[in-house]
């Protein structure tokens, strides 16, 4: 099923709770789960290269195409929400969002979304279809290094920057310590030349053969819809945080 799974969390939950017959496979097309660049970033996070991950910053912008049936939250943000859940391997505790309405009869043209995870990790998502530049970026900030995923940069999809913030003794009267930047080299790791769509299709075929649910299954699709709905609700409340209580 093409993402998002449904146009509301309730409809997605109904699908997620639908009793599948033995052997039935239900997959939602969250393609970035199968992007070799995103999966390399995830490996860097969990092998300790970045240290402790503090936050993610995601940008998905372009000048169009504009939709009138749904807001930019439901149109563009599913990708970045999916990436965030994949990288952090869990659900946020709360969501807040603000949205701008600039075109005539617009359901929402630009949005700034913040996901707060139980461990304090943050994800900031900027989505827009009224931006002059097409950008598809994810920055992962860790205590030891940071990594950028840039889907528009074919030869440099992932770049690791060995830069850390260090606490050093301070002799200033303005604080007991100060932060300094320790800069190191930048590394461009090898990314296997795999096509995400092909990888997604192969995952589906594998699930059919093994009769096991795929990585982006119906429950995953529901959780993403729950986050999108919470973001839209927060935007209507001028950015008030909305708690997430996914039921599956």
Language model regions located:
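Rossmann-like dinucleotide-binding domain that binds NAD(P)(H)
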Residues: 63-133, 137-141, 152-153, 219
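Residues embedded in well-ordered beta-strands within globular domains across many folds
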Residues: 54-57, 96, 139, 159
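Basic phosphate/pyrophosphate-binding loop/patch that engages nucleotide-derived ligands
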Residues: 17-25, 39-53, 118, 142-146
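A general structural signal for well-ordered alpha-helical segments in protein cores
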Residues: 12, 35-38, 80-84, 197-202, ...
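C-terminal glycine/acidic-rich active-site capping loop/insertion
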Residues: 31, 144-219, 240-244, 248
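Short arginine-rich
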Residues: 227-237
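Beta-strand-loop-alpha-helix segment that lines the small-molecule cofactor/substrate pocket
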Residues: 1-33
């Amino acid at each position: 099923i093409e993402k998002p799974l449904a146009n509301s969390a309730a409809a997605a939950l109904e699908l997620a709770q639908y009793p599948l017959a033995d052997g039935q496979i239900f997959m939602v097309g969250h393609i970035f789960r199968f992007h070799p660049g995103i999966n390399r970033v995830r490996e860097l996070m969990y092998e300790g290269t970045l240290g402790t991950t503090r936050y993610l910053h995601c940008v998905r912008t372009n000048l169009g195409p504009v939709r009138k049936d749904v807001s930019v939250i439901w149109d563009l943000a599913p990708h970045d929400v999916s990436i965030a859940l994949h990288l952090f391997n869990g659900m946020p505790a709360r969501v807040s969002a603000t949205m701008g309405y600039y075109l005539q009869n617009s359901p929402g043209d630009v949005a700034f979304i913040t996901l707060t995870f139980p461990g304090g990790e943050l994800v900031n998502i900027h989505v827009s279809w009224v931006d002059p530049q097409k950008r598809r970026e994810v920055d992962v900030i860790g205590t030891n290094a940071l990594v950028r995923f840039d889907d528009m940069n074919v030869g440099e999809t992932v770049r690791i920057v060995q830069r850390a913030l260090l606490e050093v003794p301070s002799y200033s009267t303005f604080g007991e310590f100060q932060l300094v930047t320790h800069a190191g080299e930048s590394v461009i790791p090898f990314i296997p030349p795999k096509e995400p769509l092909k990888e997604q299709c192969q995952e589906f075929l594998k699930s059919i053969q093994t009769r096991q649910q795929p990585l982006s299954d119906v429950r995953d699709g529901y959780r993403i819809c729950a986050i999108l709905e919470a973001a839209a609700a927060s935007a209507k409340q001028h950015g008030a945080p909305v708690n997430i209580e996914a039921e599956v």
